[in-house]
Amino acid sequence: MALTNADRAAIIAKFARAENDTGSPEVQVALLTAQINDLQGHFKEHKHDHHSRRGLIRMVNQRRKLLDYLNGKDHGRYVSLIGELGLRR
């Protein structure tokens, strides 16, 4: 199931760098991670849903690109973000 508005607001509030920050790489990666984790549960039940799997792969690739960007811009922020989200890289 998709993220609710309350879930999105909580993630944005936790990872925002400023008050109305919704576009920083940290926020975008955190939102993508929540959606990816949600879809992983969906695929445990619906193994043959290849259409949604394509969307999942697209999200994973987008998250990887954002993490690569953040790593190049500010390695300290990158390390703290992957530590907070529990990502292995």
From Swiss-Prot:
Pfam families: Ribosomal_S15. Keywords: Ribonucleoprotein, Ribosomal protein, RNA-binding, rRNA-binding. GO terms for biological process: translation. Signal peptide: none annotated. InterPro entries: Ribosomal_uS15 (IPR000589), Ribosomal_uS15_bac-type (IPR005290), uS15_NS1_RNA-bd_sf (IPR009068). It comes from the Bacteria. Gene3D superfamilies: 6.10.250.3130, S15/NS1, RNA-binding. GO terms for cellular component: cytosolic small ribosomal subunit. NCBIfam families: S15_bact (TIGR00952). Part of the 30S ribosomal subunit. Forms a bridge to the 50S subunit in the 70S ribosome, contacting the 23S rRNA. One of the primary rRNA binding proteins, it binds directly to 16S rRNA where it helps nucleate assembly of the platform of the 30S subunit by binding and bridging several RNA helices of the 16S rRNA. This is Small ribosomal subunit protein uS15. It comes from Acinetobacter baylyi (strain ATCC 33305 / BD413 / ADP1). The gene is rpsO.
